[in-house]
From Swiss-Prot:
Signal peptide: none annotated. One of its GO terms (molecular function) is glutamyl-tRNA reductase activity. The gene is hemA. It comes from Cutibacterium acnes (strain DSM 16379 / KPA171202). This is Glutamyl-tRNA reductase. Its EC number is 1.2.1.70.
Length: 444
């Protein structure tokens, strides 16, 4: 379930983000919910949920899920989020991890945010095996997109685009900068600012984390916030706590102390870190300004990225199907092994051929007998024919194993060249001309 910058707008994203603390823990208390993970960024709030196979049969449908979310107080997400399921959800998650649905197309910051969200969900023990697996595979694919296309090389991040806009209004070379906040965006801002030749970076934190942050990032702590605001050429606000980092009163004092020099503020907080009304003499570049200024990506790079994602989704789907069928393959081998053991028990201890030699021979035969159907199981998983293989095993050998229902519909992956992304509507074969050389380099 997602609210994002493109569909619902940044205002709704900001409202939703303020309501999702503790949502994963609350949802996993429900007996029909196996796992939950919340991803909250400046672009979106995304809730990933795995329900039990019998959830719908027992009355736990979309409406019930939305009620659970609303009961936690996350009303904006419950009322406004778009819901996608199974295959569509997998595609969406892979695209989000690769930055394909970000405000800045192809940006890498979201991958780090998703990795931290997964770590937090694991710490809270709310993530199921399937959710953890799909997120890890999505992150792996996002790294391939970063290394095999030029999207990451273009510096396509929210921070970079924001500083590009600042550079159109002032000279960053030799500038004095105040960073208000100590989170991931603060770290990214310091790195970007250093690479652009600023003379001084000071950091301020209302939570008392500035000293440690300053040591780690080799910047200085702003001990007097009013003095720092008066002297700074640029202020970067990225606290995002819901309480403005720069109050209207502090901004007015800074304007008065600057004696006619305007104050430039780059506000990277989704909820807005500059209190309104913004006084005269203060110019704010916020996320909405950045969104409108994002440059278009090259079509060839976009196609290459889509092709890599399609390959990653297929690899994940096949791996999931193989794992689902593994108990049946084990059961087949156990049946053959039991037959061999039964025959060995019938052999006389004294015979023309030693029992050990007969046992070794029979076990080699058993391994050969198990190899072909095991290989067929792998082929069936790749072709979306897993259930047909399982039914054949039951019909021919009478082996029945309680196998979980497929997490995603494998039939859409039977022919990789005909796979269609439900988000973009693009087929893999449409992307292959320009993107195949890069995509084929992948071996894992």
């Amino acid at each position: 379930m997602t609210v994002d910058h493109a569909e619902q707008g940044l205002g709704v994203v900001s409202e939703a983000a303020a309501q999702v603390d503790g949502l994963g823990l609350a949802l996993t208390d429900h007996p029909q919910i196996r796992g939950a993970l919340v991803l909250s960024t400046c672009n979106r709030v995304c809730l990933i949920v795995e329900t039990s196979p019998e959830a719908v049969a027992q009355g736990f449908d979309e409406a019930a899920l939305r009620r659970c979310i609303a009961d936690h107080g996350a009303n904006v997400l419950a009322e406004s989020a778009q819901l996608v399921c199974e295959n569509d959800a997998v595609w969406r998650l892979f695209r989000v991890a690769a930055g394909m649905e970000s405000m800045v197309f192809g940006e890498r910051e979201v991958a780090g945010q998703m990795k931290r969200a997964l770590s937090e969900a694991r710490r809270e023990q709310t993530v199921s095996y399937t959710i953890g697996h799909v997120v890890e595979e999505a992150l792996k694919t996002s790294r391939h997109v970063a290394t095999e296309t030029a999207l990451a090389a273009e510096g396509r991040t929210v921070v970079a685009v924001g500083l590009d806009l600042v550079a159109q209004r002032m000279d960053l070379d030799g500038a004095r900068v105040l960073v208000m906040g100590t989170g991931s965006y603060a770290g990214a801002s310091c790195a970007q600012l250093s690479s652009r030749g600023v003379a001084e970076i000071q950091v301020h934190s209302a939570s008392g984390r500035a000293a440690g942050f300053a040591r780690r990032h080799r910047v200085s702590e702003a001990l007097d916030i009013d003095a720092a605001l008066a002297q700074a050429d640029l202020v970067v606000t990225c606290r995002g706590s819901g309480v403005p980092a720069l109050s209207a009163e502090a901004a007015r004092r800074a304007v008065d102390a600057r004696r006619g020099r305007d104050l430039m503020v780059l506000d990277l907080a989704i909820s807005g870190d500059v209190e309104e009304p913004v006084p005269a003499g203060v110019e704010v570049i916020d996320l909405e300004t950045i969104r409108q200024a994002v440059p278009a990506s090259a079509e060839a790079e976009r196609a290459a990225a889509e092709h890599i994602i399609a390959t990653g989704v297929r690899h994940f789907a096949v791996d999931l199907e193989r794992r689902r069928m593994a108990p049946a393959v084990v059961a087949l081998r156990d049946v053959i092994s039991d037959l061999v053991t039964a025959e060995l028990e019938r052999l006389p201890e004294e015979g023309s051929v030693p029992v050990d030699e007969v046992a070794a021979s029979l076990r080699r035969l058993a391994a050969s007998m198990a190899h072909i159907p095991s290989a067929r199981a792998r082929m069936a998983s790749e072709q979306g024919l897993g259930d047909r293989w399982l039914n054949s095993l039951s019909d021919v050998l009478g082996i029945d194993v309680d196998i979980a229902a497929p997490v995603i519909d494998m039939s859409s992956f039977a022919n990789a060249d005909c796979m269609t992304c439900p988000v973009t509507g693009l087929r893999v074969e449409d992307l292959a001309t320009d993107a195949a050389p890069r995509g084929e380099e992948r071996t894992s």
